[in-house]
Amino acid sequence: MSKIIGIDLGTTFSAIAELDDLGNPEVLSDPESGNRITRSVVYFGKDKVIVGEKAKDAAVTKRDKVVFEVKSQMENDVIYSLKDGKFIDDNGKSKGYTPSQISSLILSKLSDYTSKVKKAVITIPAQFADRARGATLEAAKLSKLDVELIHEPTAAILHYANMPNVSLNGRVMVFDLGGGTFDISIAKVIGKKVDIMTSVGDKHLGGQDFDREIIKILDKKYKKSKGKGLDDKDPVILDIAERIKKLL
C-alpha cells in the first residue's frame, strides 16, 4: 500500500507528516533549515520563488513581493497583484496569483520533504465554506497531490483516540487555536470508535488577530510618544508583535 501523508496547511505555519515503518506519525523536517514547521510565506523574486523562513526575511526589503496569510483569502475571488503588492478583486484584467496558486507553492515545498508520495490528507478549519474547500482542492491539484480534507480539530480527536495505551470514552471536546482561526470539534468516543457530533469555528480569532491587537496597543503608545503612528504592515513591527505574543 502506498504511503499517505498528512499536511497542516496553516495560516502562519505549515507542516507535513507521514507514518513510519511502525505506523507512528513522524513530522518531516525541511532539509534546508532542519525545522519541522514551515512558514506559510511566499516570495516572488525576479528569477525564482521562495517559500518559508527565507521568504519572510525577504519582506524586510521587498514587502510587495511577499505573500503572508494566503489561507485567509481562500474563499475570496481575488488575486495577489505583484504590481500592487496586495490582494485585489479579480476583475479578469490584472495579472497575478490566485490564493490556490500561492497555496500550491507551499504544498509543493512540503511534498518535496518526502519521496514520490502523491496521496495526502489536508486539515482545514471547521468553518471553511465550500468555496474555500474547493480552492484548497485546486491548490492540491496544482501541486499534483490527490487529497482528502478533514477538519483540524477532528484530526486531533482521531489521533488521540488511536494512540497506544490511550482509552477515551464519552464526549470529547478539542480546541484548535491556530494562526488564523479558532475551531472546536465535539465527538463521542468509545475506544477507537469516533463519532463527530459537531465542528464549528471563528475565522477572525487566531494568532494573527492577537498580533494585530498588540500592534494597536503599540501604535497608541508610539503616537503618544512620537506624535505619529506605526505601519501595521511593516514586517519588523509584525515580528515585534509576534515576539511579544510569545512572551505573554
List each model region and its residues.
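Short, well-ordered amphipathic alpha-helical segments that serve as non-catalytic structural scaffolds
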Residues: 105-113
